[in-house]
Amino acid sequence: MSNKMNEESWNRLSVFYQEFTRISLNNFHYNPYGPGDKELGIIGDVKGLDVLDVGCGCGQNSIVLSKWGAKSVTAIDQSESQLDYAKRLAKREKQDIRILKCDMEDMSILPDASFDLVVSSHAMNYASNIEKVFMECSRVLRYGGRIIICMAHPIWIVLGEALEKGNLNSIANYFDTKRERWDWERRSGEKIATFESTPWRLSQIVNALCNAGFVIKRLEEPRGYSEEEMRKIPADAIPYADAMWRNEEFIKANQIVPYSLIVAAVKQKEAY
């Protein structure tokens, strides 16, 4: 099962990922080298809300929402290594977060209508069935509850890596949505772990949300910061960045096409 492979790969990658990535504990992150929610203002006031973070990784966004005054925060992920780190981080930051091992395509351990807000940052492309994920998100949300998802922008999947590598011959086929297998590598080219992800088309994302009873309220396609802009911003004010080096090729490509697609929607009806 590809989801099992992703779980095992994140268990292998976790220590390296946390060592070589700088992720804010004070601003909700979306885009590498780009603005967070303090700048974009998508999430809004979370005071008094029960929040679910789907694919929480090491829990940085969960910790941020807890600090911002959420009534409760539940964080789920498949990777035990990531969750162990999340528990240590939450304890260090003195935040009371419920952290659970859970598959986002089957959240049956969570009761119906138990959350006001579901958030997810760059987890949805790992799903093998995005309709199942959105159906589950709808099930656990109360009526009028919101979902805010950030995922790989379909335009980036088609063009981004080609621009990053300076090789337009490697432009991907937008209509090919077969699962992709790829390696996470060190800068030296040494493979650390192998993952599978799905290059969801925009229509698949939108239709899956609509079929799950959501009404889309807002779309954002944030441009990442340029090198010039980053020179004027304190390093710790960038919510997500590489810790040891700066990926200049990615930064340049993200000035041309968006890396992330952010969708905010409201649950207003039963799933179809």
Region spans (language model):
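Conserved class I S-adenosyl-L-methionine
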Residues: M1-K47, Q60-V64, L89, R146-W184, R223, ...
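Class I SAM-dependent methyltransferase SAM/SAH-binding core
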Residues: L52-V54, C58-D106
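A short acidic, Gly/Pro-enriched loop at the edge of an enzyme's catalytic core
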Residues: S108-L117
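A short SAM/SAH-binding and catalytic strip from SAM-dependent methyltransferases
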Residues: D116-I130
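A short glycine-rich, Lys/Arg-flanked "PGG" loop and its adjoining helix->strand segment in the class I
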Residues: E131-R146
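Acceptor-substrate binding/catalytic loop of class I
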Residues: I155-V158, E190-S203
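Short alpha-helix
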Residues: E196-L219
